[in-house]
Amino acid sequence: MASKVIHAIYNDDDILMNAVKKVRAERYHIEEVYTPFPVHGLDKVMGLAPTRIAITSFLYGLVGLSVATLMMNFIMIEDWPQNIGGKPSFSYIANMPSFVPIMFELTVFFAAHLMVITFYMRSKLWPFKKAENPDPRTTDDHFLMAIDAGHHDVEKLSKFLHTTGAIEISLIDNDEDH
Amino acid sequence: MYTLPSKLKLFAIVFMVIGAIGIVSGFLTAPKTTAEVKEMMAAHGDGHGSDASHEAPHHETATTHEAAPSEGHQDAHSSEEAHLEHTLHQMQNRPWSALYIACFFFFMIALGALAFYAIQFAAQAGWSQVLFRVMEGITAYLVPGGIIMFVLLALSGFHINHLFVWADPEVVAHDKLLQGKASWLNGTWFLVRAAIFLGGWMLYRHFAVKFSRNSDDETDNRWFKKSFKISAGFLVFFIYTESMMSWDWIMSFDPHWFSTLFGWYVLAGMMVCAITTIALITIFLKSKGYLEVVNDSHIHDLAKFMFGFSIFWTYLWFSQFMLIWYANIPEEVTYFITRIEQYKLPFFGMLAMNFLFPVLLLMNSDYKRVNWFVVLTGIVILAGHYVDIFVMVMPATVGSSWYIGIPEISSIFFFFGLFIYVVFTALTKAPIVMKNNPFLKESKQYHY
């Protein structure tokens, strides 16, 4: 079903922030906001849920720590406990100080890389992905707010958006799903 | 203006009195002769576990010698006497060490707060101005704490007590290594250095506070610029003197041992304690309604510093430990062998208190804003760093005769009471939030 979306373009992040507040106060649904740079507090005024990526990172770190511990315990203690320079390979804890640098690095490695990959997957970013950019100016100096026109009166909505400081307003037929 | 509540004053005085009584009783109950040591050891069933294991080989040699002919018997007797003498010295050192550790612990909080204060000026931080008066209050302890510290150092450096082995001329006469270090480690030069360090720190503290108070009555940035300059100068002075202070006041307890990153290690512990104390006093004052301008974000920043410096401390602790453990050079590794054999629980326990606890509790951004979380972690961190100083000092002075009993706890009580009294009295001397600083407005509106 083809839905209609209104694209309102702003040229200042402060005006955009105020516009977002007003639009939300009028209970219109904001589909998306496109900005050329991070606007501090935009997620808060849009009412977006906080990210959980730090929690995933912590869990990945624990995985990395486990991998390091299990790997070195198997290799250095269980599989072939050689005497290497007199280091005590009787138990993992007896030789632990020499394993700590690797435990630390693998924790960081897993936490960092898996978190980045999670970020790419969750935000659907990969090479050769088709850019979802409604207006190329939003990567330079313009801000675009996409509002679901839905069952609203388009005339009234456009007038309202003008009062929030939009410099351009256009009605878009949104028939492709991305 | 903050007024010292009479309840808090009473609280501090009670702690000081109880502590003082305990300290005196600690000195009175310390044994004076080897006969008393023998009695005490018999009464306590050879003390605690680590004590017994340490003494077992000595007793064995003593009994085997006793079975031998008469000339061997005398040997046995003298070796037992030597052992008792050794234990006597350890037990006599205990109340002194307990006093020294508590004194240094609270002194280093004030010193760390002073360094942190100077860093805030030199870095032109934009969040901490509303906390400056709290920091100034904490650094007020630098003067009385430093004077007590100096007296203790003088008593030890001139061998009134046996805390520093290098201060005993008889020991030095038979010790080539100590003779080699005597040009640095001798009573006079030791005290001259201590006077220079303490004098420099107190001088900066005096002028930093004076400039800060002066700026309250001005509208221009004259005093801020002066504070900035002396803070930058102080930080240079501080990093050299702090390093030497740690060799003198802590590392020289084990004068046969040395470690190059020791100064940093002491500094890291000092900074954690100072920032934790700043956070605790800030939360306390805010809860009493004196620091309305302080918001969650300020607490969050302090908690981040607590978290970060805890990890930094652990990094240095591990770097020092692991390098020595790995290379296992006999003259270096004895330091850790005595600690692991005789101080297993405090030595590894402090790692849990100073690392695991803050890392797990303060990792979450939301928890850093919850006051009781910060207070809980802060108390554990402070206790952990007391144990850290304990494990740095005690093995060299009392060895296996350690215990956390009346002398240790009383010393903590006494200096805690003094610290509270001095800090909160100092807080009444000036408005609790400064009036004029170019970053003040930013700090008041600080939001993270």
Provide a role label for each language-model segment.
Chain B
Residues 20, 55, 60, 64-84, ...:
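Long, contiguous internal "core" modules enriched in hydrophobic/ aromatic residues
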Residues 254-258, 329, 367-371, 392-407:
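Extracellular/periplasmic helix-loop-helix junctions in multi-pass membrane proteins
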Residues 6, 260-266, 331-351, 399-423, ...:
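Membrane-interface transmembrane-helix boundary segments in multi-pass integral membrane proteins
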Residues 2-17, 97-98, 129-147, 186, ...:
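Alpha-helical transmembrane segments and their helix-start/interface "positive-inside/aromatic belt" motifs
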Residues 26-44, 103-215, 234:
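Transmembrane-helix bundle segments that line or gate the permeation/cavity pathway
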Residues 1-91, 162-183, 209-228, 290-297, ...:
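Extramembrane terminal tails and long inter-domain/linker segments of multi-pass membrane proteins
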Residues 110-115, 147-148, 194-205, 268-283, ...:
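Hydrophobic cores of alpha-helical transmembrane segments in multi-pass inner/ER membrane proteins
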Residues 373-383:
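Central hydrophobic cores of alpha-helical transmembrane segments
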